[in-house]
Each structure stands twice: as structure tokens, then as C-alpha cells.
């Protein structure tokens, strides 16, 4: 899985170790 702070995209929550992709309105987010 992707570690904390890794780049992720909309709908990618399941690939983050935390299970959450945090968005701040950009084209990509970071795994939180």
C-alpha cells in the first residue's frame, strides 16, 4: 500500500495504507 504522504488520486482510498486519500481541491491528494 502507499505510505503516509504518498500521492493518490480520487477513488484511490483503498491503495493508501491508512485507507484514506486526503483532498484539498487539487488534481491529486495525499495518503493520510
Curated annotation (Swiss-Prot):
The UniProt keyword set, sorted, is: Amidation, Disulfide bond, Knottin, Neurotoxin, Secreted, Toxin
Source organism phylogeny: Eukaryota, Metazoa, Spiralia, Lophotrochozoa, Mollusca
What are the recorded GO MF terms, alphabetically?
Answer: toxin activity
The keyword Protein biosynthesis belongs to this UniProt entry's keyword annotation: no
Q: What is a single cellular component term in the Gene Ontology annotation? A: extracellular region
Q: Where in the cell is it found?
A: Secreted
List cystine links: 1-17, 8-21, 16-31
Statement: the UniProt record of this protein carries the keyword Disulfide bond: yes
The free-text function statement in the UniProt record for this protein reads: Elicits hyperactivity when injected intracranially into mice and produces paralysis when injected into the pedal muscle of freshwater snails, Pomacea paludosa, but it has no apparent effect after intramuscular injection into the limpet Patella opea or the freshwater fish Lebistes reticulatus.
State the name under which the record lists this protein.
Answer: Conotoxin sr7a
Q: What does the entry's free-text domain comment contain?
A: The presence of a 'disulfide through disulfide knot' structurally defines this protein as a knottin.
Give a brief account of the tissues where this protein occurs. Answer: Expressed by the venom duct.
List every position bearing Serine amide. 32
Q: What is its main location?
A: secreted
